[in-house]
Amino acid sequence: MENAHTKTVEEVLGHFGVNESTGLSLEQVKKLKERWGSNELPAEEGKTLLELVIEQFEDLLVRILLLAACISFVLAWFEEGEETITAFVEPFVILLILVANAIVGVWQERNAENAIEALKEYEPEMGKVYRQDRKSVQRIKAKDIVPGDIVEIAVGDKVPADIRLTSIKSTTLRVDQSILTGESVSVIKHTDPVPDPRAVNQDKKNMLFSGTNIAAGKAMGVVVATGVNTEIGKIRDEMVATEQERTPLQQKLDEFGEQLSKVISLICIAVWIINIGHFNDPVHGGSWIRGAIYYFKIAVALAVAAIPEGLPAVITTCLALGTRRMAKKNAIVRSLPSVETLGCTSVICSDKTGTLTTNQMSVCRMFILDKVEGDTCSLNEFTITGSTYAPIGEVQKDDKPVKCHQYDGLVELATICALCNDSALDYNEAKGVYEKVGEATETALTCLVEKMNVFDTELKGLSKIERANACNSVIKQLMKKEFTLEFSRDRKSMSVYCTPNKPSRTSMSKMFVKGAPEGVIDRCTHIRVGSTKVPMTPGVKQKIMSVIREWGSGSDTLRCLALATHDNPLRREEMHLEDSANFIKYETNLTFVGCVGMLDPPRIEVASSVKLCRQAGIRVIMITGDNKGTAVAICRRIGIFGQDEDVTSKAFTGREFDELSPSAQRDACLNARCFARVEPSHKSKIVEFLQSFDEITAMTGDGVNDAPALKKSEIGIAMGSGTAVAKTASEMVLADDNFSTIVAAVEEGRAIYNNMKQFIRYLISSNVGEVVCIFLTAALGFPEALIPVQLLWVNLVTDGLPATALGFNPPDLDIMNKPPRNPKEPLISGWLFFRYLAIGCYVGAATVGAAAWWFIAADGGPRVSFYQLSHFLQCKEDNPDFEGVDCAIFESPYPMTMALSVLVTIEMCNALNSLSENQSLLRMPPWENIWLVGSICLSMSLHFLILYVEPLPLIFQITPLNLTQWLMVLKISLPVILMDETLKFVARNYLEPGKECAQPATKPSCSLSACTDGISWPFVLLIMPLVVWVYSTDTNFSDMFWS
């Protein structure tokens, strides 16, 4: 039934053709069940395991690798001789990597879809209904309830469907609907129509929503919606319809994969076409097909060389390390890619209750009467410190602590707070915190009594459990609570009837009253001044109400409660307590004692975090279900708004937002910093608008109502104390529910991205080098310098370790003083592409050069000519060009070993270059990142392992090297450092001046002291002797060029 909240009870019952006392007939139930189905949320049809596995192979890079593995496998199948076993190593290793990646991907996907299933925990199992087949109430399975059913609900029940209340059988009905609306206190319900058809859920005071809990009272109602038509069902549909966005990093890697695949395809085709003339060479037995297959194998090797196989593993490792660091800061990351997304967050949409505030109602101000003279009076105003339920804080007057027992008015005020109260404090030993037992408002009063300690109770030596209610217990020992007159909407107050535990002539029964100031003060005839009772005059009443109005509408927007006493109430037997309409008669002729002002206070550390966000160029938007006045007041206190800032176009209620045109709504999302009284649909709409501006949005939430927006935003952040639905729909969970933790996580995300950029570039330059190497050997007609299994080893192991270590680079000191990076900013800029292309070309040329050196100039090598080397495929005994040359020498493992050793060594030097994007190694020595030094040592040790430990040399088709050969490797490798230092110098001084923190604002002088400033002399002293020794030793290097 649409808009049931706007209809009268009679209209709703008439719509379903049902009587409240008898319920539906079995025939009606059958028809309604056929029409509306079961009252349950349908199970989400998840993807099958096969679908999830296939999905993991949709990535372009993965598909290219898979194709390369399949082709390698087919080629290995037809391999002959000794190479048969080693030929299978390459496809096997590639497939192993792909399977491992797929397993990780499937595991993450499985976790992600739990959010929709978690909604089922809010479905009650049973419900109590009236139906015509039985004369009394009957318990049935909640899934069998249909629209039109008459349902009975009482305290402790979970509401089984969306229900329009028809009658309330207790004084009041309170409902905890925080999971759905985010309201921090339980809501009082009534049966009157709410005429507004566009009312938000918070304002539908005559409706009960499926999955919410009855906090107090008993009532009956008619079911108006079941299953997916309930409010919680609509949230489920919204979550199902929400597609998960790919993170900026995933998008960048997708783009990179596309570009790389095109480049790889072009180079592979080019290599194959260049060598068409060699297809008929004698080495292939004169068979054109054999020659074509041989060069096709080289093209496949090229594809393997060009793809950074280690990149997914290194990225996963780096993100996993980042999650561990975040976990130490109380941010538990559920989705690895979201770690990096945090780094480019430009908007944080934060819930108010529990995130920006403590969600622990706290009395912060109170007043009692000091003096009264006719129509004028003066007040004693007090402030109270402490912003949690912990009974720690003090009462201050004019910023100085006071002893409360010195004020009679405060003693009576504390007595009312303790006795007119059904809540208590409890110390949770497991969590180590004080928690509320009962209502938030009443717990705040209990905590206030503990801070006041009006009877000067000795508190030292008490355990934390005993301390929780020590002062309240002293007051409760003095008077006994006989009965309670429950809160009702008409009088807006509640009271308790108390008698002294030790009767005497002076002590007598009293009624203590608390409630909304306008309701209580209108029924006060007197005011308490010290221990005396003075008549209430219009002037005094006006003064009291003006202070209360100021507290309620000022910068604090406090929730005020008036506290009063009835000194001479009727005796219990004279009261008619069966009818709650009589309660107001017994709460008249009251004496006003004082007033307390409370609020859900902002967390202490939030203001500094909001300031840090502003410095970092991140906009903070508060989105709350609370009312606008309270929301704006908290915004002012934490710095989202300035104290006197005009919030006309910067703060909206859900209703005001709905009334705007679509273009005005877009503009509102661009400028607003506060949305109050909102529903789940508003949150999702706000996220959509922000995403249309290319903003990267982090959304916080804890309730079921937050789940769709958490899932839709780039970063969904759930509270540790939140619902299971919110947690499973989000990428990150805050263990301490603290906004400041988000800011710390953003900082960590930025540092991770910077480091990730370094190792991605490092791996790419390595792959460029491998591609250039294979392309050069094919173009020059040289024997293979590197084979696929060697390239896999380099890409996965020897490159992977330093790349992972680069994730430990220390973050920049000014990382939170820069605006968020543009998510569309390329991973590699034009200059950096040129830089790494230049380095890559040197890596490739050096690798080919090392292999050529062994053939042409090395002692112990064949010393063939360049022509013979470039036409080695024509080598046979009867060819005069190869007279005296043993053709088997062209299959020697030495040149491959030289090429592989140069490639590994040069990559270690390149890792040192990647320590900083633009800073010189002379100023930032390797030990700035000790993990990098360790990983380089480990990579070189692994290289020695495959060189010198049998049978590894056989698998990798390499052989041990002697000292001269190692010196040659170093001679060829070390210049890459000089080359990158030159490119860094150009970047620092001509292309990106001022980007480095160390860069001086003025042009540096050319004096020797200025040039040597900041140089790490220990590094210079360490490296210089090595360089001199390497380059002073003769290795026949020049013979290669003069032969």
UniProtKB/Swiss-Prot annotation:
PROSITE patterns per UniProt: ATPASE_E1_E2 (PS00154)
Name of the featured protein: Sarcoplasmic/endoplasmic reticulum calcium ATPase 2
Sites of 3'-nitrotyrosine modification: 294-295
Family membership noted in the UniProt record: Belongs to the cation transport ATPase (P-type) (TC 3.A.3) family. Type IIA subfamily.
Gene: Atp2a2
Record comment: activity regulation: Has different conformational states with differential Ca2+ affinity. The E1 conformational state (active form) shows high Ca(2+) affinity, while the E2 state exhibits low Ca(2+) affinity. Binding of ATP allosterically increases its affinity for subsequent binding of Ca2+. Reversibly inhibited by phospholamban (PLN) at low calcium concentrations. PLN inhibits ATP2A2 Ca(2+) affinity by disrupting its allosteric activation by ATP. Inhibited by sarcolipin (SLN) and myoregulin (MRLN). The inhibition is blocked by VMP1.
Membrane-spanning ranges: 49-69, 90-110, 254-273, 296-313, 757-776, 787-807, 828-850, 897-916, 930-948, 964-984
PTM note: Nitrated under oxidative stress. Nitration on the two tyrosine residues inhibits catalytic activity. Serotonylated on Gln residues by TGM2 in response to hypoxia, leading to its inactivation.
Binding site for ATP: 353, 442, 489, 514, 559, 624-626, 677, 683, 705
Protein EC: 7.2.2.10
Catalytic activity: Ca(2+)(in) + ATP + H2O = Ca(2+)(out) + ADP + phosphate + H(+)
Taxonomic superkingdom: Eukaryota
Region (Interaction with HAX1): 575-594
Binding site for Ca(2+) 1: 304-305, 307, 309, 795, 799
Keyword tags: ATP-binding, Calcium, Calcium transport, Disulfide bond, Endoplasmic reticulum, Ion transport, Magnesium, Membrane, Metal-binding, Nitration, Nucleotide-binding, Phosphoprotein, Sarcoplasmic reticulum, Translocase, Transmembrane, Transmembrane helix, Transport
Lumenal side: 70-89, 274-295, 777-786, 851-896, 949-963
Tissue: Isoform 2 is highly expressed in heart and slow twitch skeletal muscle. Isoform 1 is widely expressed.
Location(s) in or outside the cell: Endoplasmic reticulum membrane; Sarcoplasmic reticulum membrane
Region Interaction with TMEM64 and PDIA3: start-end pairs: 788-1043
